[in-house]
Amino acid sequence: MQADLSNIIALYGGSFDPLHYAHMEIIRLLRENLLYKRIILMPNYRNPLKSSSFFTPLQRLQMCKILADEMNNAKSCNQKIPYISVSDYEVCQNRSVFSVQSVAFIKEQITKQDTNAQLVFVLGEDSFNNLKQWKDVEKLCKMVDFVLIKREISQKDSQISPHIVPYAHVIKCLDLPPSVAHFSSSSVRSLLQKGQIDEALNLVPVCLHTFIKANFRL
C-alpha cells in the first residue's frame, strides 16, 4: 500500500513506561519531516507481550498529555508543524489490546474526519523485527504502512529482519541520534528502583519531572 505523503497521520504507540528523551526525539523527528498532518500518541494499557507496567496506565496517559502539550506549545517559526494529540483508546479498554485492533479503530476515526487521510504506524526497529510474533500481522500490514525508527548502535541492530519485509511496507526510516539512541524506559525504571532519582530524571524530559516525583514511590 503506497501512502500519499501529503496526507498522513502518524500513530506512535507504546508503553511509554515512562517517556524519556528518545521518545521525545522520535516525535521531534516526525514533526520535522513535515510529512504528517498529525501525530497521535497512544499509550497502551499493557503490552500483550509483557506481564505488567511500572507506572499505571492512567499515569502513562497523563505523561503523554503533558509532553504533547509541552511540544505543541513550544514556539516554532514553522506554522505547518504537525499537531500532537493523545489517544486514550487502549487505556480505556482496561485490558491488553492488540495493535491490529487499535489501528482499525484509529483508521475508522480519522477517515470519518477526512476520507483521504492515511495512517502510518511508527515502530522502533526492535519491535518491527518482532512483528511476526504479533497477532494478525498480515492483516495489520495490509492496513498500514510503517515508519521505522532505527537505533544506530551496532551493525547488527541496524539490520531489518528479512522475514518481515515481505509482510510490511516501510515508507520511511528515521535514525535516532547517538546522544539518545541508548536511552530506554527500562534504564529509567532501574534507576528509579535504585533510588537514583536525579540520574533517572536526567533521561526524562523536564516537563515530566514534577509528575514523576509526585507519582513515583519506592
UniProtKB/Swiss-Prot annotation:
InterPro entries noted in UniProt? Cyt_trans-like, NadD/NMNAT, Rossmann-like_a/b/a_fold
Q: Which Gene3D superfamilies match?
A: HUPs
Top enzyme class: transferase
Its GO biological process terms? NAD biosynthetic process
> What is the catalytic activity of this protein?
nicotinate beta-D-ribonucleotide + ATP + H(+) = deamido-NAD(+) + diphosphate
Which molecular-function annotations from GO does this UniProt entry contain? ATP binding; nicotinate-nucleotide adenylyltransferase activity
What UniProt keywords apply to this chain's record, in alphabetical order? Answer: ATP-binding, NAD, Nucleotide-binding, Nucleotidyltransferase, Pyridine nucleotide biosynthesis, Transferase
Give the pathway annotation: Cofactor biosynthesis; NAD(+) biosynthesis; deamido-NAD(+) from nicotinate D-ribonucleotide: step 1/1
Enzyme Commission code(s) on record: 2.7.7.18
Q: Keyword ATP-binding: yes or no?
A: yes
SUPFAM superfamilies from the UniProt entry? Nucleotidylyl transferase
Q: Which HAMAP family match?
A: NaMN_adenylyltr
What is its biological role? Answer: Catalyzes the reversible adenylation of nicotinate mononucleotide (NaMN) to nicotinic acid adenine dinucleotide (NaAD).
The entry's family comment says:
Belongs to the NadD family.
UniProt protein name: Probable nicotinate-nucleotide adenylyltransferase
Q: Quote the gene name from the UniProt entry.
A: nadD
